[in-house]
Swiss-Prot record:
Segments for region (Disordered): 18-110, 128-206
UniProt subcellular location: Nucleus inner membrane; Nucleus envelope; Cytoplasm, Cytoskeleton, Spindle
Organism of derivation: Mus musculus (Mouse)
Chain's role: Nuclear lamina-associated inner nuclear membrane protein that is involved in nuclear structure organization and maintenance of nuclear envelope (NE) integrity and NE reformation after mitosis. Plays a role as transmembrane adapter for the endosomal sorting complexes required for transport (ESCRT), and is thereby involved in ESCRT-mediated NE reformation. Promotes ESCRT-mediated NE closure by recruiting CHMP7 and downstream ESCRT-III proteins IST1/CHMP8 and CHMP2A to the reforming NE during anaphase.
Gene that encodes the chain: Lemd2
Protein name as it appears in the record: LEM domain-containing protein 2
């Protein structure tokens, strides 16, 4: 038993009906002891079966020839139904005690199955299992057929899966009390898959959690940032939409209007006059608010402005309330004399200024246009988008201006550097010319400015380098004492020349 590998140990335990867990160095000895106990229990059960079957074995002798004939018929039909029989035998429980044939029948039937029994005996001995001699080749024959179809089914089959019937043959159908194949293996009939799942779960638990924690933090940060941006955008929309118009507030203000009851002073007259004036102002307020809202939301009525002319407003009020023009003028007079904001502006010839008297009123405009929620949202969204675009345009303009300034500064630096390089070249040319003159290699001690330019700048670059050359000439005239600019007549023409001035070796104090 000590020489069994882990796979063989697992198969032995599964064959005896025990489902082992992971086999490691610490659990291997435990499973070996378990296998030893299970084998001992199996031997005890086999001995009990031998003692119990000793009596019924004598009664089963006369049925030996019939059993031989039935087995011969089944062997002839076995090739035709080999595949279905294998699938049936996988789930069929082993019989507890098959009816043994008579001694004479067993000796006669040992011929066809003698080789199989002899080959199966060493396997049973290596497994540590003992089978009674009277049990016949039925269980072993079933084992051989099932092993021929699948090696894995042999490992998971247990020798103690027997039906409670004592005289049931091995080819008889299983009884209702037989235990299924999956019940013997436990909840998980595939130990290899269970072990692989356990191993993967252990590997997942040992995986470092730093990356997952960082992912969770980043996802939460993005979520809160998105919610913050959404709330900010909704707040901007709400601010741009403004508060909805409140006609009830205007109506409450209108209830404070004085009533024109000059001729009639009774309470009924005053109540009627007050109700009529409130109705007129309420209708006027609604009319102006709707017209102003339509003008702001697409202007479907093609209005010139949201300031409605007085005559048009008066005609509308007369059609709706059937009130005379005097009452309309009285309402305008009260609006002008009231210090409260009723939501109606009275404008004169200049739309930017409010009228002070009824005669100067040209048009009426609502201070709180009545717009739908869709129009308010679209206007707020348009305003927000416009402001954002203006901001980005300003930002782009400033960015472009900065890029332009940086480009300009870089060009100036490059031009200044080129000017210094040109000054160095001019000094070298003039100094070399003076040295050549001292060595009688040149006729004159000076050299023409244009001659120096033509020798330093190629023709195709003179237009591009003109600014650099002019700055170099100015720099030499104002900052270089070793080069003097003079005017000489050369070849009959006056020409500006440069002369190299050699500094004296001694100062006046040394002399």
């Amino acid at each position: 038993m000590a020489g069994l590998s882990d796979l063989e140990l697992r198969r032995e335990l599964q064959a005896l009906g025990f489902q082992p867990g992971p086999i490691t160095d610490t659990t291997r000895n435990v499973y070996r002891n378990k296998l030893r106990r299970l084998r001992g229990e199996a031997r005890l059960r086999d001995d009990e079966r031998l003692r119990e079957d000793a009596g019924p074995r004598e009664d089963a002798g006369p049925r030996g020839p019939e059993r031989q004939r039935e087995e011969a018929r089944l062997r002839e039909e076995a090739p035709l139904r080999a595949r279905p029989a294998a699938s049936v035998l996988r789930s069929e429980p082993w019989p507890l005690s098959p009816s043994p044939p008579a001694p004479s029948a067993a000796s006669d039937a040992s011929g066809p199955y003698g080789n199989f029994g002899a080959s199966a005996s060493p396997w049973a001995a290596s497994r540590g299992l003992s089978y009674p001699p009277h049990a016949g080749p039925g269980p072993l024959r079933r084992r051989a057929s099932v092993r021929g179809s699948s090696e894995d089914d042999e490992d998971t089959r247990t020798p103690d899966r027997h039906a409670p019937g004592r005289g049931r043959h091995w080819w008889a159908p299983p009884s209702a009390s037989a235990r299924p194949h999956s019940a013997l293996l436990g909840a998980d009939a595939r130990p290899g898959l269970k072990g692989s799942r356990t191993g993967s779960a252990g590997a997942g638990r040992t995986r470092p959690e730093v990356g997952r924690w960082l992912e969770r933090c980043l996802s939460r940060l993005l979520l809160w940032a998105s919610l913050g941006l959404l709330l900010g955008f909704l707040a901007i929309l709400w601010v741009k939409m403004g508060k909805p118009s409140a006609p009830q507030e205007a109506e409450d203000n209108m209830k404070l209007l004085p009533v024109d009851c000059e001729r009639k002073t009774d309470e009924f007259c005053q109540a009627k006059q007050k109700a009529a004036l409130l109705e007129l102002l309420h209708e006027l307020y609604n009319f102006l608010a709707i017209q102003a809202g339509n003008f702001e939301c697409g202007n479907p009525e093609k209005l010139k402005s949201k300031c409605i002319p007085v005559l048009e407003a008066q005609e509308y009020i007369a059609n709706v309330t059937s009130s005379p023009s005097s009452r309309f003028k009285a309402a305008l007079t009260w609006i002008l004399s009231s210090n409260k904001d009723v939501g109606i502006w009275l404008k004169g010839e200049d739309p930017s200024e409010l009228a002070t008297t009824v005669d100067k009123v040209v048009c009426l405009e609502s201070a709180r246009p009545r717009m739908g929620i869709g129009c308010r949202l679209s206007r707020a969204l348009l305003t927000a988008v416009t402001h954002v675009l203006i901001f980005f345009w300003c930002l782009a303009f400033l960015w472009g201006l900065l890029i332009l300034l940086k480009y300009r500064w870089r060009k100036l630096e490059e031009e200044e550097q080129a000017m210094y390089e040109m000054v160095k070249k001019i000094i070298d040319v003039v100094q070399d010319h003076y040295v050549d003159w001292e060595q009688d290699m040149e006729r004159y001690p000076y050299v023409g400015i244009l001659h120096v330019r033509d020798s330093l700048i190629p023709p195709q670059s003179r237009r591009r380098m003109k600014r650099v050359w002019d700055r170099a000439v100015e720099f030499l005239a104002s900052n270089e004492s070793r080069i003097q600019t003079e005017s000489h007549r050369v070849a009959g023409e006056d020409m500006l020349v440069w002369r190299w001035t050699k500094p004296s070796s001694f100062s006046d104090s040394e002399r």
